[in-house]
């Protein structure tokens, strides 16, 4: 008996249906790729009992039938393509939504669900600077059944504080108590010598997950909207080839660091230190982030990417053009 998947066309309204997407993915591996439940558990980072429960639920809900719904199959093919091209451990592609604010919120919800499925009691999670990581933190702290420990990777405390509208915030915060960008390199170096900051830096190395946003080089970027950098700073960065940032380090299209005076005053881990962290999850989407996401992937800074379908398609198109690939796309995958 052959079995395939059917999922109703999913769109994000009040929340992203992460469990349904997970059921589809498990059913695909089990029925289409003939993997064992133990193999699927290892790939997805969840236990075998949960795999069995979700397979049963998928049958009850009618997600397992005799057809593959094109929208879900396309995303799944695209996810596999990203893993192969950019050497990712995992990727989650959600349906796209019209506005950038709705997209950021949908991505934040999806990321919080993804991480919440994989963390244990009293887990430690590193958080980068920015609007999307801040939203993820608030959703995660509300969803987590047991307290989580959140480590700030950068200065700029405001983005690590709970949203005042949250009724529940189940997280212990370990913050670097200083601005994101200091007035001088001397002050930055002296602060890094402080025992409290060194303790936080050491905690970051043993955290279970590391969550980072990916910034574009445009006037809507968090770092410029908050007047941390001026429009003139951005123009200069663009002239130097910057297409985006990760942990507030600006990089070119190939993922190389743009070395400026800003680097000497930035309270953030060195770009070369990112590979020392466990399970680095990058979360970003939207047309203004395409080059930035491509650059971060090319630089091999991520273990996991969470983005939306339109952005993922555009990043693959950019990969094709940069690598002079003249191929047809079938179901979201490069052939």
Cite the ranges covered by each PLM segment:
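Conserved phosphate- and dinucleotide-binding cores of soluble alpha/beta proteins
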Residues: 15-27, 32-39, 50-56, 62-68, ...
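Short, surface-exposed alpha-helical recognition segments that flank or form part
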Residues: 14, 99-103, 284
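Single conserved hydrophobic/aromatic residue that forms the stacking wall/gate
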Residues: 1-12
